[in-house]
Amino acid sequence: MKKIFLRIVLLLILANVGFGDVIQILGSNYSIYKGNVYYGNEILEGANPKTAELIGFSLLKDDKNVYYMGEKIKDVKIKNFEKLGQNYWKNENKIYYRDKKIEN
């Protein structure tokens, strides 16, 4: 019985060797792999894989920026960022739908 248990443990250990670089899928287009954030197969330069999270359809947020379809949305202050609902978000006094500012 002890030999069977040791074989199972050894098999589980060996099965995990080489799988340390697991890809993390965020929605249908974003992913995190080997310390980089990707949109499709393109690296999002400057995106933080530790804080990246999908917040809506093709919208990704990290600790510094918001991205829509892999493009950084300009003039966004993450400190004042607030998600309102699916694909709607607020930054300071501006409300956005995806990457478009909604005019008053």
What residue ranges belong to the model's regions?
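Hydrophobic h-region of N-terminal signal peptides that target proteins for export
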Residues: L11-G20
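Generic cytosolic/nucleocytoplasmic N-terminal low-complexity/intrinsically disordered segments
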Residues: M1-K2, L60
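Non-catalytic tandem-repeat scaffold regions and their flanking low-complexity/translocation tails
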Residues: F19-N104
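Sec-dependent signal peptide recognition
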Residues: K2-L11
